[in-house]
C-alpha cells in the first residue's frame, strides 16, 4: 500500500478555499496510486483556535462531499483536519473518508495546555484496517503522550500517522518523538506538517517518515508544499509537487 502525507499551507479560516486546495493534493495522491492520504492538523481552517467556535462543523457538512466522492471513485482513505462540535463542546478533529463508508470523526484525546480552555478532549481512540495495514491516526500533541502510542501497539497497528502543526523551534523535538515511537513500538511512523504560517507560528515543514528502527527514511523540505509517499511493500519513497517536480534531498 502507498501511504501519502501532505505538506501544505492553509488559508486562515477559509474552509471553502482550503477544500479547493485539498482536492488538488488528493488528485495528485490518486495519480500516484496512494491508498491513504493524511493532511496536517486542522488543515481545512488552519491552526486557528480563536476561530474554532465560529468555524466548527461536523463530518456531514455538505462542503466535504467532493472529498468523499474522490474517496469513493478512487479507493483512497483521506484524513483532513477540522474543528468539530456537538451540542456543547468543540473538538480538534480529523475527518476520515473511506470508500463507500460512513465518515469517521477522530477527535484529539490529549490536548496541548493552551488548547484546553477552548477545546474538549476526544474520548474515542481508533485504529483503521486498510488493506493489509492497521493505521493509528494521531493529532499533534498526542505524540507526546505514551498512552496514545501504547493504544496503537495494543491494537496491532503497523502504521502511525501524525497530523501536526510543528513550528521552527519545536520541529527537532517532534521528530525525535516520532523516531522513538517508531523504534519503541515497531511502527512505521509519519508526520504531516504545515509550511508557511498558521496560528501565529512559522511552520517548519519537514514532513517525514521513519521505519520501524526509528531511522528517518523520507523527508520533505522546510518550505515547499508537496506530498511524500511511502510504499509499505517496496519501501519506495516518492516526493511530488503540484507542478510535477520531484523533490530531492538527502533522504
Question: Predicted segment positions?
Answer:
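Short polar catalytic/cofactor-binding loops
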Residues: 7-13
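Extreme N-terminal starter segment of soluble prokaryotic enzymes
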Residues: 1-5
Amino acid at each position: 500500500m502507498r501511504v501519502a502525507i501532505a505538506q501544505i499551507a492553509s488559508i486562515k479560516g477559509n474552509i471553502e478555499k482550503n477544500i479547493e486546495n485539498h482536492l488538488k493534493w488528493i488528485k495528485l495522491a490518486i495519480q500516484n496510486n496512494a491508498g491513504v492520504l493524511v493532511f496536517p492538523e486542522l488543515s481545512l481552517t488552519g491552526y486557528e483556535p480563536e476561530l474554532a467556535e465560529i468555524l466548527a462543523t461536523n463530518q456531514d457538512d455538505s462542503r466535504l462531499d467532493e472529498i468523499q466522492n474522490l474517496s469513493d471513485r478512487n479507493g483512497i482513505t483521506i484524513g483532513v483536519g477540522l474543528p468539530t462540535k456537538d451540542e456543547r463542546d468543540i473538538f480538534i478533529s480529523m475527518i476520515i473518508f473511506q470508500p463507500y463508508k460512513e465518515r469517521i470523526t477522530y477527535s484529539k484525546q490529549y490536548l496541548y495546555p493552551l488548547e484546553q480552555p477552548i477545546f474538549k478532549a476526544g474520548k474515542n481512540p481508533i485504529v483503521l484496517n486498510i488493506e493489509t495495514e492497521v493505521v493509528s491516526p494521531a493529532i499533534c500533541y498526542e505524540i507526546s503522550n505514551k498512552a496514545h502510542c501504547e493504544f496503537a501497539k495494543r491494537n496491532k497497528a503497523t502504521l502511525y500517522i501524525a497530523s501536526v502543526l510543528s513550528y521552527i523551534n519545536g520541529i527537532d523535538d517532534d521528530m525525535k518523538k516520532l523516531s522513538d515511537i517508531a523504534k519503541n513500538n515497531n511502527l512505521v511512523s509519519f508526520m504531516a506538517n504545515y509550511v508557511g504560517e498558521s496560528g501565529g507560528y512559522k511552520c517548519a515543514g519537514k514532513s517525514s517518515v521513519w521505519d520501524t528502527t526509528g531511522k528517518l527514511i523520507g523527508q520533505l523540505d522546510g518550505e515547499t508544499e508537496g506530498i511524500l509517499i511511502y510504499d509499505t511493500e517496496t519501501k519506495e519513497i516518492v516526493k511530488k509537487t503540484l507542478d510535477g517536480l520531484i523533490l530531492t534531498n538527502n533522504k
